[in-house]
Swiss-Prot record:
Name recorded for this polypeptide: Zinc finger and SCAN domain-containing protein 12
Intracellular or extracellular location(s): Nucleus
GO CC annotation terms, alphabetical: nucleus
SCAN box domain segment(s): 46-128
SMART domains per the UniProt record, alphabetical: SCAN, ZnF_C2H2
Pfam families cross-referenced by the UniProt entry: SCAN (PF02023), zf-C2H2 (PF00096)
Listed Polar residues bias regions: 207-221
CDD domains listed in its UniProt record: SCAN
Family: Belongs to the krueppel C2H2-type zinc-finger protein family.
Length: 604
């Protein structure tokens, strides 16, 4: 494990030169050591803490004191908040429960939270599942990852497990490290050998623990075992160093060519030697640093040929292109819905499983997606940044504002595919579609029509005459709550539905829609008998009674029947009778009574 923070012996000339240049940025050797220590100390102290053994101390009090010290050095409560410390603990456990073949790959990305681990795994699974040619920058990484999952021997059969390879590497590492130090001293002098020794000494908080840690961090957790020098050192092999097949110092993967060795060392989890000058974040690969720096520079070199949108990374561009190709390779087994990204499918499947990972700290309500929690929190903060320019009403979500604006414009973007009926709100469309999608198993005993359960209850009020919704001002009652709401606007004077063309306002949305057809000239309701067209469905129904002879309105006094319940407008009466004022007044009074009830009022 010393190779984790030491300068590796098999680095090529360019890599060693890069480290030298990096070292010159610091004024003293102590500054350089401090920089290296800060980069790796948190992970080192975590491993010291987890693998600390009781046998290393003289008694329980010293053991407890040492554990507290190591935990303090790892979690750093003086600089981290409680939430950050909890996230570190969750992240550690998450990495621990991952399959061993995935741990090395995830740790190479150096995630700082559990969410970053999820993103790395989802991206990896998606890229490995994608058919065709992969991104060239990651091809070597994918091949290396597959090699780590199922390493093959000479005969093409699976070789020893990864854990066995690690154990073998542990026994071979002292000899190999000694030979690497000799090569390094020959090529570059003793400067880097001394630097490596200084860094190693600086990272030793307690004598025996460091030695134990360098021998094997992963195996020393089994407390009580003793590791004597003669037990961990093998006899030198008869073959020369040139005859040995090179292996990775981190996970023991065999490498056939020197070029593969160099590429693998760049991929394998190790030191983050590439640091960002702007924010100080470090990376293990230069390509990752280059892509990260575009956040500060604003550079977006990868441009979509279809829409011209630009991106910082090639992988993000590839994901974006799925929008144009329409490819949706990830399909839900429950409902058959397809998605362009695996992460989107994963989120969708929570609707079926009922998983809700995101909880509100204020009320405890849970959500399956982070966006849902984000919008919900605004209920508690009373944050309503989206304001309607027509009525100044504010909303917490832009989508709700867009739907609300349909009240003023009369727009109904949500249309039913079955019957063509349109709605302002998507929720109204969903409720309406239950009529088509749900089985109509509830039949009215009066007329034989079938409804859903809620629809039948509302329909039966027509036969029973029940009107549960009553106006508190005039005591008029209605079958539906929506009818009461529209009626109450007569008393309040509210006219929320305004015409954009002439400014005229209405109490009902349906009246506004019909009025707007005056400006557009639209007459969508056509009579099949004579071809006459009308702006509203009510006008068509009244007209069709001419052909059918239907007269549903009957006078209670004499029994005379009428086709419509029309009231003559006040303006029309006064204009027609301006020469005879008394007659106009009489007609005006009679107009207050429906046509089918005024036929017998001879006293007027």
């Amino acid at each position: 494990m010393a190779s984790t923070w030491a300068i590796q012996a098999h680095m090529d000339q360019d890599e060693r030169l890069e480290v030298k240049i990096e070292e010159k940025k610091y004024t003293t050797r102590q500054d350089w050591d401090l920089h290296k220590n800060n980069t790796h100390s948190r992970e080192v102290f975590r491993q010291y803490f987890r693998q600390f053994c009781y046998q290393e101390t003289s008694g329980p009090r010293e053991a407890l004191s040492r554990l507290r010290e190591l935990c303090h050095q790892w979690l750093r409560p003086e600089t981290h908040t409680k939430e950050q410390i909890l996230e570190l603990l969750v992240l550690e456990q998450f990495l621990t429960i991952l399959p061993e073949e995935l741990q090395a790959w995830v740790q190479e990305q150096h995630p700082e939270s559990g969410e970053e681990v999820v993103t790395v795994l989802e991206d990896l699974e998606r890229e490995l599942d994608e058919p065709g040619e992969q991104v060239s920058a990651h091809t070597g990484e994918h091949e290396m990852f597959l090699q780590k999952m199922v390493p093959l021997g000479k005969e093409g059969e699976p070789s020893m497990p990864l854990q066995s390879m690690k154990a073998q590497l542990k026994y071979e590492s002292p000899e190999l490290e000694s030979q690497q130090e000799q090569v390094l001293d020959v090529e570059t002098g003793n400067e880097y050998g001394n630097l490596k020794q200084e860094v190693s000494e600086e990272m030793k908080p307690h004598g025996n623990t460091s030695s134990k840690f360098e021998n094997d961090m992963s195996q020393s957790a089994r407390c009580g075992e003793t590791h004597e020098p003669e037990e961990i050192t093998e006899e030198p092999s008869a073959c020369s160093r040139e005859d040995k097949q090179p292996t990775c110092d981190e996970n023991g993967v065999s490498l056939t060519e020197n070029s593969d060795h160099t590429e693998h060392q760049r991929i394998c989890p190790g030191e983050k030697s590439y640091g960002c000058d702007d924010c100080g974040k470090t990376f293990s690969q230069h390509s990752h640093l280059t892509e990260h720096q575009r956040i500060h520079t604003g550079d977006r070199p990868y441009k979509c040929e279809e829409c011209g949108k630009a991106f910082r990374g090639r992988t993000v561009l590839i994901r974006h292109k799925i929008i144009h190709t329409g490819e949706k390779p990830y399909k839900c087994n429950e409902c058959g819905k397809a998605f362009g990204r695996w992460s989107a499918l994963n989120q969708h499947q929570r609707l079926h499983t009922g998983e809700k990972h995101y909880h509100c700290n204020d009320c405890g309500k849970a959500f399956s997606q982070k966006a849902g929690l984000f919008h919900h929190i605004k209920i508690h903060t009373r944050d309503k940044p989206y304001q309607c320019t027509q009525c100044n009403k504010s909303f917490s979500r832009r989508s709700i504002l867009t739907q609300h604006q349909g009240v003023h414009t009369g727009a109904k973007p949500y249309e039913c595919n079955e019957c063509g009926k349109a709605f302002v709100y998507n929720s109204s469309l969903v409720s309406h579609q239950e009529i088509h999608h749900k089985e109509k198993c509830y039949q009215c005993k009066e007329c034989g029509k079938s409804f859903s359960q809620s629809g039948l209850i509302q329909h039966q009020r027509i036969h029973t005459g029940e009107k549960p919704y009553k106006c508190e001002v005039c005591e008029k009652a209605f079958i539906q709550r929506t009818s009461l709401t529209e009626h109450q606007r007569i008393h309040t004077g509210e006219r929320p539905y305004k015409c954009d063309k002439c400014g005229k306002a209405f109490t009902q949305r349906s009246v506004l829609t019909e009025h707007q057809r005056i400006h557009t000239g639209e007459r969508p309701y056509k009579c099949d008998e004579c071809g006459n067209a009308f702006r509203g469905i009510t006008s068509l129904i009244q007209h069709q009674r001419i052909h059918t002879g239907e007269k549903p309105y009957q006078c209670d006094e004499c029994g005379k029947a009428f086709r419509q319940r029309r009231k003559t407008s006040y303006k029309e009466i006064l204009l027609k009778n301006h020469s005879e004022p008394q007659a106009g007044v009489n007609l005006l009074l009679s107009s207050l009574i429906p046509e089918w009830q005024s036929c017998c009022r001879k006293d007027l």
